Amino acid sequence: MKKTLFLLLTLVGFSVQASSVLSMKERSVLIDNILEQRFSDVLPHIMEREGIDMWVLMSREYNEDPVLKTMLPSTWISARRHTMLVIYNPGNGQPLERLAVARYAVGSLFKKAWDKEAQPDQWEALKHIIEARNPSKIAINTSDSFALADGMTSTEHDKFMAVLPEALKSRVVSGERLSIGWLETRSDLEMQYYPVLTQIGHSLIATAFSNEVITPNVTTTDDVVWWLRDQTRALGLTNWFHPTVSIQRQDNEVFDQISAFSKRPGENIIRPGDLIHVDFGITYLRLNTDQQQHAYVLKPGEKDAPASLKEALKSGNQLQDILTGNFKVGRTGNTILSMSRQQAIEQGITPAIYTHPLGFHGHAAGPTIGMWDAQEGVPVQGDYPVFAQTAYSIELNAASFIKEWNKEIRIMLEEDAFFDGQTVTYLDGRQTEFHLIHSDKNQ
C-alpha cells in the first residue's frame, strides 16, 4: 500500500510538472518566434548602442561560435558546412538585413546570399557583400576576456582579414560588447516563459527534498542527485551541469570553502538532524536555471528546524535583499559587490557573493558580481556594467553560528531573477523557509 501511495504521489507531481512542458514541435515554433522578436526588437537597439552597423559571424559544422549557435533556427542543431552570417543595420529605422553567405538559407531568419554556381569562392562572396554595403564598423567575435564573445577561430580570422580590401580592414572591430549585449538581453517573449522554467526547477527541488524521495537513514545524497537527473530527462529537459547534494550536520567537521567549491561532495547517507543543500540547473527553450536551496531533516518528535538554523536562513535572505537593492543601470559588477559586502558586514552578516548573469548559458555573458574565491572583485568581467532587461542567478552564502550545533554553517542560496532597469524580481520567488523532511514513519 505504501509503495502504491508513493508511486501515486510521484506520478501526480510528475504530471503537474509535465503539463508545463511544451512538446518538441511546440517548442520549435516558440523558439523561432522568440528569435524573430530578438532580431526585430533586441538586436537593433544593441547595435545602435554600440555604434556598429555590420556584424559578421561564422562557424564550421560542429565548431560553433557560441553566439552564432544562439541565432540558429530551432530545427538547426548545428551550423552546416561553413555557415557565414552577415547582419547589417542600414539605419534610419529600417529593419536589419540578415544574410547567410552559405549554401543554404538559415531557416527564415537569414536569407541565402551566396550563389555557389556564380561565385565558387565563399570568401569572395562574403567580401562582395561587405563592399556593397560599405559599413563604417565591422564587428567580429574576438575577445581577450569574455569567452562567449571569442567565437571566431584563428583560422577564420586570418582568412577573413586576408580577403578584405585594405580600405575595410581598418573598420574591423571586436564585437565583444555586441556579443554580450545579444546574449544578456532578454526579450519580452522570453520573459513570459522564463518563470515557467524556474517554477519547474523549484518543483523538482521540492519533490527531491521531501519524503517522496528521501527516507532518512536509507537514502543517500547520490540517490537524490540521480533522481534529479532522471526526472529532468523524463520531463524532456536537460541539465547543463551535474547536480550536487551536500550535507552540513552537528559534528566536528568545519566548513571548508575551498573543498566546498572545488570538490564534489562524497556520497553520504541522509540522517535526522541534517541540513541538506542542493545545486541544480535545467535547460528549456534555450534558457537555463541555476538554483540552490536547503532542506532540514526533522529528528523524531521535531516539528520544525532549530531556531538558529531558521535565523541563519533569514540572514541569507537579508544578504539577498542587500545585493539586489544595489542593482542599478550602469553600475559595474565590482561596484555592486563592494557596496553589498560593506553593507552586509555593517549589518552583522558574514557574506560571500558570487552572482552571475543567466540566460542562453548558465554562467552567462555580462557583469560578474564576485566569485567565491575573488571577494575583492573580478578584473574586466567585474568591470562590465549592468544593463536593463537582463537576468541573473543571485548566488551567495552567509555564515552563521548555530548554537544548537556549536559550530558555524553556511546558508548557500541561489535564485533566478530579472532586472528590468529599476527592480530585481525573482522569477518564481525565493526560499524563505526550509523544506522539511520527516523522520517519523507515521508523519
Question: What is each residue range found by the language model?
Answer:
Residues 1-4:
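Positively charged n-region of N-terminal signal peptides that target proteins for export
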Residues 6-9:
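Sec-dependent N-terminal signal peptides
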Residues 13-15:
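N-terminal signal peptide c-region/cleavage motif recognized by signal peptidases
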Residues 19-443:
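Active-site neighborhoods and metal-handling regions in enzymes and metal-associated proteins
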